Amino acid sequence: MRIPLLAPDNYAFPDPAYALARCDGLVGVSRDLDAGRLLEAYRNGVFPWFSRDGWFFWYAVGPRAVIVPERLHVPRSLAKTLRNGSYRVAVNGCFAEVVAHCAAAARPNQDGTWIAPEFQTAYLKLHEMGHAHSFECHYPDENGKTRLAGGFYGVQIGRVFYGESMFALQPDASKIAFACAVPFLADLGVELIDCQQDTEHMRRFGSELLPFADFAERLRMLNAVPLKEEIGRREVACKGL
C-alpha cells in the first residue's frame, strides 16, 4: 500500500473518503505537526493518532461517533455523584497539566502513549491560539486543599468541539468534567462534539454514529460559525442534573 506523503509547505489533506474505502483510515503521514496542519486536519475530520521514527500518522474514522449536546445522557449513578459530590469543575485552569496527565495515563491494550512530547507541544500551541481547551475536575484532599482529580482536553473550531483524551486520578473525575462541560459548551453555541471512535464509555453519554460523509458536511457548516462567546478560563457549573 502506498502511503500519501503530506507536503511540508501545503496543509491540504487528501480526501479522507479514499482512506476509509481502504478500511485502514490512514489519510497520510507528515514530518511536521504544525498548528496550521492540526487545524486543517480537524476541519476535515482527520486527526493525528501516533508518531513513529519522526513521522506523524493522520487518520480518519467512519462512521464517526459524535454527541449532540442537547441529547447528552448522564448515567444515573453519575448523576447521583454529581448531585452529592464536593467537586469543582473549571475550564482552562491548568491545560498543560491536563495534557501531561493524559499522556501518562495507562490505557488498556496499549504500550505507552501516543501523546509524545511533540504532541504536547503542538496542543499547547493550539491552546495559546485559543483553539485547544481543558476541562478539569478538582476534589479536596485529606487536608481540605483542592487538587486536580481528572479531566480531558480537546480542540474547538467554530461550533464543533473535538475531544482528544481523558484521565482520572479519582473514580469518575473525568466523567464529572465531561458531564459538566457538555452543557457549558452548548450554552456557548457548540452543536457537535466529536468523540472520534465508537466506545462504550462515550455510548453511555449518548454518543451516536454518523456516516463520515454526513459528519464531514456538518463540519463544513459548523466550523465556519463562531461561538456566541469565547470559552475563556472560568468555573463551570453542572446544569440540569
From Swiss-Prot:
MF term (GO), any: leucyl-tRNA--protein transferase activity
Keywords: Acyltransferase, Cytoplasm, Transferase
Annotated GO CC locations: cytoplasm
SUPFAM superfamilies: Acyl-CoA N-acyltransferases (Nat)
EC number, UniProt record: 2.3.2.6
Cellular location(s): Cytoplasm
Transmembrane segments: none
GO biological process: protein catabolic process
Catalytic activity: N-terminal L-lysyl-[protein] + L-leucyl-tRNA(Leu) = N-terminal L-leucyl-L-lysyl-[protein] + tRNA(Leu) + H(+); N-terminal L-arginyl-[protein] + L-leucyl-tRNA(Leu) = N-terminal L-leucyl-L-arginyl-[protein] + tRNA(Leu) + H(+); L-phenylalanyl-tRNA(Phe) + an N-terminal L-alpha-aminoacyl-[protein] = an N-terminal L-phenylalanyl-L-alpha-aminoacyl-[protein] + tRNA(Phe)
Domain of life: Bacteria
Stored InterPro entries: Acyl_CoA_acyltransferase, Leu/Phe-tRNA_Trfase, Leu/Phe-tRNA_Trfase_C, Leu/Phe-tRNA_Trfase_N
Function: Functions in the N-end rule pathway of protein degradation where it conjugates Leu, Phe and, less efficiently, Met from aminoacyl-tRNAs to the N-termini of proteins containing an N-terminal arginine or lysine.
Family, per entry: Belongs to the L/F-transferase family.
Name of this chain's protein: Leucyl/phenylalanyl-tRNA--protein transferase
